[in-house]
């Protein structure tokens, strides 16, 4: 009896705890809502301004309903103005212009075409009029839908074609039953014009948000982010002690993440920037497509940074004692690349051409020093130079194997196989011991591993026997185990140097791709009419920037 009471009390406690958890969990989420709302506005204060602009626009357009004189003039069709404000008013001025003009042109063309259809079908009978309207709806609908597949129309006027189809069908089909269809089209056009006018006023004149400026800032931020990623990657690779892994977001990944994910954002911002009027003091045309090209080149450059980051996460790593031999030229080479990226970011940010000495002699000196450092350690990358001794030992082991095989030919088939296997193992051990002695005599000694060839040969022989037994039993499916990381390292004499060779080659590839980035940025400055580089005014700023390029913060505009 006591056991039953005890079990019942436990179940009751579990039920109460679950109920308490179900009650407290929503309350905890509700408490986090104000903080999340605050963070949304803190990340980009322009979001708060946009929300206030939308609220004010809806209030103004609602006056068409609230004020009696305006309502009498427009009537119930004023709801189209409210719908226009909700649909058209976007975050940036370019997006609002794109949607507003598309909606206005679509409505105007659809109304004109519907009026023409009504004028032609007015004199025909009721049946012929229905057939004519149905045929017109079919042809116009099919043609407009097919036009939407054209890439240029899809990119720039897709929303306008949708509004055209909607307005044309509403007016044309309703004209068969309603006589005052022209008045309906007239009222709808005016209400949509009022809504679009309010949206354009709010977007262009009240704290305007330009897509071109957002594209400009994101390009600067991507250059700065790549610079920080490269610097952090090289610093972490040459750290003396291994860094403990944390759950926080990787600082290296944060730098190049925006570059890899920027394709759709750049194209959208460039599309909206193409609709925006010239609003700068010089009134130059905004080179939106050139910004897209710069973004594409930066993504190609970013892939190299991703591969460089991958060198830090490989399973087989070069010992830190070996990395230290090449630390100085690699750090200087990466520093020069970071300086160049920071200079490009500053030139775009300040609307000026970059320095003519952006690729300084220090970069070429760092490349030459890295090349000399690698050449100074040939045994590290090419293995031992004493190939003649290896050949002698190999020839001796092969001759010994043949001699033992001839002597043991009369011992039987199985015994002959075992003796030849043992001789092969003995010869292989001699080669391994000779290679280890040569590694000790080299300039740089790597941590050596002893290849257990006998175990490998025994494994192969047992694998054949087990495979034959399983095939006899009818079980033919078997997964062959793969070699471990140690087996891979023992199979290559210079396997420890391969990760660093990949790291160094990626640094050199980064320098090669830097030329493409500089060319596109210079082309951007030429098209956008950037001001010329002033050596006297910018010399001090360049010296300060080049010392610590990683402290520059990214300012990326929001885009919708």
Swiss-Prot record:
Pfam families in the cross-refs: ALMT (PF11744)
Predominant place of localization: membrane
Record has Iron as a keyword: no
Biased composition (Polar residues): 407-421
Keyword Ion transport assigned: yes
Subcellular locations according to the entry: Cell membrane
Region (Disordered): 386-421
Reported induction: Not induced by aluminum.
Keywords for this protein: Cell membrane, Chloride, Ion channel, Ion transport, Membrane, Sulfate transport, Transmembrane, Transmembrane helix, Transport
Consequence of gene loss (knockout): Impaired stomatal closure resulting in a wilty phenotype.
Tissues in which the UniProt entry reports expression: Expressed in roots, stems, leaves, flowers and pollen. Mainly detected in the roots vascular stele and in the leaves guard cells.
GO BP annotations, alphabetical order: malate transport; stomatal movement
Protein origin, superkingdom: Eukaryota
Transmembrane segments: 54-74, 78-98, 104-124, 130-150, 156-176, 189-209
Mode of membrane association: Multi-pass membrane protein
UniProt record similarity statement: Belongs to the aromatic acid exporter (TC 2.A.85) family.
Listed PANTHER family: ALUMINUM-ACTIVATED MALATE TRANSPORTER 10 (PTHR31086)
Function: Malate-sensitive anion transporter permeable to chloride, nitrate, sulfate and malate. Involved in dark-, CO(2)-, abscisic acid- and water-deficient-induced stomatal closure. Belongs to the R-type anion channels.
Protein name: Aluminum-activated malate transporter 12
């Amino acid at each position: 009896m006591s056991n039953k009471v005890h079990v019942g009390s436990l179940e009751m406690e579990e039920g109460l705890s679950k109920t308490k958890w179900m009650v407290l969990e929503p309350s905890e989420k509700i408490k986090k809502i104000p903080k999340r709302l605050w963070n949304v506005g803190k990340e980009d204060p322009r979001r708060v301004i946009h929300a206030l602009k939308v609220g004010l626009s809806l209030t103004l357009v609602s006056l068409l309903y609230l004020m009696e004189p305006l309502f009498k003039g427009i009537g119930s069709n004023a709801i189209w103005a409210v719908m226009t404000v909700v649909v058209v008013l976007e975050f940036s001025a370019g997006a609002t212009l794109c949607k507003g003009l598309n909606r206005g042109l679509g409505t105007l063309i659809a109304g004109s075409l519907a009026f023409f259809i009504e004028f032609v079908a007015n004199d025909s009978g009721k049946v012929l009029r229905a057939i004519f309207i149905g045929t017109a709806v079919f042809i116009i609908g099919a043609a407009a839908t097919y036009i939407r597949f054209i890439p240029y129309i899809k990119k720039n006027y897709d929303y306008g074609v949708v509004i055209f189809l909607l307005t044309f069908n509403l007016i044309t089909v309703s004209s068969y039953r309603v006589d005052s269809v022209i008045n309906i089209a007239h009222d709808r056009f005016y209400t949509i014009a009022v809504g679009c006018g309010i949206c354009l006023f709010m977007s262009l004149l009240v704290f305007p948000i330009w897509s071109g400026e957002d594209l400009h800032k994101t390009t600067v931020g991507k250059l700065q982010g790549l610079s920080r990623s490269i610097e952090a990657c090289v610093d972490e690779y040459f750290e003396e002690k291994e860094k403990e892994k944390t759950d926080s977001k990787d600082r290296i990944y944060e730098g190049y993440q925006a570059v890899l994910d920027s394709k759709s954002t750049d194209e959208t911002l460039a599309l909206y920037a193409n609709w925006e009027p010239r609003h700068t003091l010089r009134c130059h045309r905004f080179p939106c497509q050139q910004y897209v090209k710069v973004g594409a080149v930066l993504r190609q450059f970013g892939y190299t940074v991703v591969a460089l980051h991958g060198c830090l996460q490989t399973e087989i790593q070069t010992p830190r004692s070996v990395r230290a031999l090449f630390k100085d030229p690699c750090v200087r080479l990466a520093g020069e690349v970071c300086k160049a990226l920071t200079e490009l970011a500053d030139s775009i940010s300040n609307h000026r051409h970059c320095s003519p000495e952006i690729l300084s002699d220090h970069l070429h000196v760092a490349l030459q020093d890295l090349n000399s450092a690698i050449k100074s350690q040939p045994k590290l990358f090419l293995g031992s130079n004493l190939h003649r001794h290896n050949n002698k030992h190999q020839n001796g082991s092969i001759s010994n194997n043949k001699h033992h095989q001839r002597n043991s030919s009369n011992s039987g088939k199985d015994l002959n196989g075992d003796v030849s296997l043992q001789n092969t193992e003995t010869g292989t051990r001699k080669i391994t011991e000779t290679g280890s002695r040569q590694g000790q005599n080299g300039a740089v000694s790597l941590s050596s591993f002893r290849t257990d060839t006998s175990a490998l040969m025994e494994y192969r022989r047992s694998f054949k026997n087990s495979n034959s037994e399983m095939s006899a039993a009818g079980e033919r499916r078997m997964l062959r185990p793969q070699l471990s990381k140690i087996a891979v390292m023992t199979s290559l004499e210079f396997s420890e140097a391969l990760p660093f060779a990949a790291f160094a080659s990626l640094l050199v590839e980064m320098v090669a791709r830097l030329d493409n980035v500089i060319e596109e940025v210079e082309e951007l400055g030429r098209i956008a009419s950037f001001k010329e580089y002033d050596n006297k005014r910018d010399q001090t700023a360049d010296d300060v920037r080049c010392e610590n390029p990683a402290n520059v913060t990214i300012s990326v505009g929001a885009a919708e």
